[in-house]
């Protein structure tokens, strides 16, 4: 008779776990959850330490740090307890020696056993002191209306990163920064998208993005107030739409902007999300900077024999600030196509940070073939009551990074409303119960008939005895007509009034109401081989009959606005409608009211903006045209970077120019955007239309557009968002 099988050694394990706890065997079967899996990996590492003659229980090891990293987002109580246990161990226990780095444990295979350098303890103390000070300061800093930033700023949430930096060589500590030291990698390059199915049809989507960002010295170290007044264009009658007059504050900082769908998701991800999900919402955002490299450029000899020499500068610094409390003007870069770009393998640049400054603008409204002269084409001067000049140095806490350092913003949590990823086909005429048929067709080509007029039953909103589909009472209005292609006057000059893409009129009479024109370049999806210096352009015509059903009907290359406009296309307060021809009711009629229902603007992949800041006014708009998600209270803080002034010995504070060492830098930006989606239930008998590519090389959805050419040319045209129809009533 065979001896009974030995029961596996099982130490103290909390309920629901197999490996989380001391004294366990390594053959307990499959882990029960991610925290238990991290504990199993941790136990296996401890086993290897013991076999090599080291005691991991009395010393803090790399396995302990790995367990901390793997459980930092743990949702289960056991993972949280284990996470903080080993963080406490890290604070008090000496470090275990490795083959490449001597520590304070008893065994070291190579090299002389030495004490840790004194600066490590000094940096630890500085990091903890500055962390406490920054956290206290951040918790007390609020917006002008008393609303705090949801993420708590970069100081509080980057505590783990600061502690890790203080442990490593060259730790800089403080704020949201850390140090890995020269030649030490401080991050990973990751552009994957992960889908975690949570049950009940919910899916957590984690989009990771990484970019190599190039940063040059600013053109000037000063803030500049610059005026643009293109009188050459606007002095020509009919060119009001070409008016560019404004003043802006140009800053020496650059904006690291990831607020575009193409930064986070590859085309196949967008296809999968839109084909299988019914709604989408934002959850959280994390950003970090690592592997900072700063270099100086010097020239030897001159003329045609000049040779440029590039050297690492270990003393130069890069400055980083995050506007967590939204103090500075909000300037999303997607509308100017200046985000981080849509191709992870291509280096990119940050967008120069600039913002509008208040100045009055007076321009006469003109039209084509107008007689007479233009009376007004002037700009005003700054006014004391409206002038707001912001500087980053006076409004933000700035972190200084050197070569090898890193920085993290912490986690921002969104408070937004979900957006549907299906389109509606029902207009007012399709709400409710169809009329009762009196006769049925006898053949497939025949039509049915209704009861004769005068004998029908039903509710109408007309004082006649008719009951027809045109006048039946409906519960609400789906979509609405609104004035469009109109220019409104403002103190800063004329502007095209924003339009909601909710028009439901038929055929060409709708005049592309609510359409948005996208012009973009090589980093954002342009077919540069075909277009050359001119940008590629598409119009997102969301209200086209085929929009959401057929991509080529949604994205067109024709422009909806004619410049200069004809007389009959312009309405001003001096022109009564009755004196003009070809003015349709849709140019002036507004059917928006308390009974109006309409769809939210669609996300536009890849060029569209993702989130937007809520306007700080007592009465908020129901939506924004620029982005599908509007952040309640604060939006994610804008990340700003610049190279610190690298001066020469010729610096003169009274001089007209700065004598600077030519310096540039590169760094890796990495982000994590977490979203939550709902799986779409299959309800129809018939197959549904979905986003799909075609073999035809001339079609809009030809697969060749998303494939590289022999010279590496890539194209990424806009993709639809709402391919599948849904019932709304």
Curated annotation (Swiss-Prot):
Species classification: Viruses, Monodnaviria, Shotokuvirae, Cossaviricota, Quintoviricetes
Entry keyword Magnesium: yes
Subcellular location: Virion; Host nucleus
Protein's organism: Murine minute virus (strain MVMi)
Domains: entry comment: The N-terminus of VP1 is sequestered within the mature capsid. It contains a phospholipase A2-like region and putative nuclear localization signals.
Biological process, per Gene Ontology: clathrin-dependent endocytosis of virus by host cell; microtubule-dependent intracellular transport of viral material towards nucleus; symbiont entry into host cell via permeabilization of host membrane; viral penetration into host nucleus; virion attachment to host cell
Protein name per the record: Capsid protein VP1
Basic residues bias spans: 1-10
Principal subcellular localisation of the protein: virion
């Amino acid at each position: 008779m065979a001896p009974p099988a030995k029961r596996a050694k099982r130490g103290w394990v909390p309920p629901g776990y197999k490996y989380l706890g001391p004294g366990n065997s390594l053959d307990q079967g499959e882990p029960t959850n991610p925290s238990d899996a991290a504990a199993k990996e941790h136990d296996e590492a401890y086993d290897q330490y013991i076999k090599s003659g080291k005691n991991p229980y009395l010393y803090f090891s790399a396995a302990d740090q790995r367990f901390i990293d793997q459980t930092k987002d743990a949702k289960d109580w056991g993972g949280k307890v284990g996470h903080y246990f080993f963080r406490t161990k890290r604070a008090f226990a000496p470090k275990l020696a490795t083959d490449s780095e001597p520590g304070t444990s008893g065994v070291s295979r190579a090299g002389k056993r030495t004490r840790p350098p004194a600066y490590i303890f000094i940096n630890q103390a500085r990091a903890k002191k500055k962390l406490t000070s920054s956290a206290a300061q951040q918790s007390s800093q609020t917006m002008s209306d008393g609303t705090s930033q949801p993420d708590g700023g970069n100081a509080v949430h980057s505590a783990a990163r600061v502690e890790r930096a203080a442990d490593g060589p060259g730790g800089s500590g403080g704020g949201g920064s850390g140090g890995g030291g020269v030649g030490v990698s401080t991050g990973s390059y990751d552009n994957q998208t992960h889908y975690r199915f949570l049950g009940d049809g919910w899916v957590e989507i984690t989009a990771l993005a990484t970019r190599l960002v190039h940063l040059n010295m600013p053109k000037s170290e000063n803030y500049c107030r610059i005026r643009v007044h293109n009188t050459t264009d606007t002095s020509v009658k009919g060119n009001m739409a070409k008016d560019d007059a404004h003043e802006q504050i140009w800053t020496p900082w650059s904006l690291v902007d990831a607020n575009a769908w193409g930064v986070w998701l590859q085309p196949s991800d967008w296809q999968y999300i839109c084909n299988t999900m019914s709604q989408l919402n934002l959850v959280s955002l994390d950003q970090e900077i690592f592997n900072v490299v700063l270099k100086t450029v010097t020239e030897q000899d001159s003329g045609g024999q000049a040779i440029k020499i590039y050297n690492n500068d270990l003393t130069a610094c890069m400055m980083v600030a995050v506007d967590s409390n939204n103090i500075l003007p909000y300037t999303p870069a997607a509308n100017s196509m200046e985000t981080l770009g849509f191709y992870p393998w291509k280096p990119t640049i940050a967008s120069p940070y600039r913002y509008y400054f208040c100045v009055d603008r007076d321009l006469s409204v003109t039209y084509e073939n107008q007689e007479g002269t233009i009376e007004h084409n002037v700009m005003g001067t700054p006014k004391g009551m409206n002038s707001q000049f912001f500087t980053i140095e006076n409004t933000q806490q700035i972190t200084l990074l050197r070569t090898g350092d890193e920085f993290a913003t912490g986690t921002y949590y969104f408070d937004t409303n979900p957006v549907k990823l299906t389109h509606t086909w029902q207009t007012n005429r399709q709400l409710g119960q169809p009329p009762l048929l009196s006769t049925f067709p006898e053949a497939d080509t025949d039509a049915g008939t209704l009861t004769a007029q005068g004998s029908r039953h039903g509710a109408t909103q007309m004082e006649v005895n008719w009951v027809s589909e045109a006048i039946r009472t409906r519960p609400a209005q789906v979509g609405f007509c609104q004035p469009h292609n109109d220019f409104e006057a403002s103190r800063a000059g004329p502007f095209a009034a924003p339009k909601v893409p909710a028009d439901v009129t038929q055929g060409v009479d709708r005049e592309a109401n609510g359409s948005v024109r996208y012009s973009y370049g090589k980093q954002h999806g342009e077919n540069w081989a075909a277009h050359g210096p001119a940008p590629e352009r598409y119009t997102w015509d969301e209200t086209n009959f085929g929009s959401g059903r057929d991509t080529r009907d949604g994205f067109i290359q024709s422009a909806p606005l004619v410049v200069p406009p004809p007389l009959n296309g312009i309405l001003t307060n001096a022109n009564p409608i009755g004196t003009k021809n070809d003015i349709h009711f849709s140019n002036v009629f507004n059917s928006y009211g308390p009974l109006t229902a309409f769809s939210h603007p669609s996300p536009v992949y890849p060029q569209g903006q993702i989130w937007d800041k809520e306007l700080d006014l007592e009465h908020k708009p129901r939506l924004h045209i620029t982005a599908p998600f509007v952040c309640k209270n604060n939006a994610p803080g804008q990340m700003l970077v610049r190279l610190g002034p690298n001066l020469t010995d010729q610096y003169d504070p009274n001089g007209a120019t700065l004598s600077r060492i030519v310096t540039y830098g590169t760094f890796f930006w990495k982000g994590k955007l977490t979203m939550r989606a709902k799986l779409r239930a299959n309800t129809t008998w018939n197959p549904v239309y979905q986003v799909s590519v075609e073999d035809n090389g001339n079609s809009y959805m030809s697969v060749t557009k998303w494939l590289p050419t022999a010279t590496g040319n890539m194209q990424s045209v806009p993709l639809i968002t709402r391919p599948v129809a849904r019932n709304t009533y």
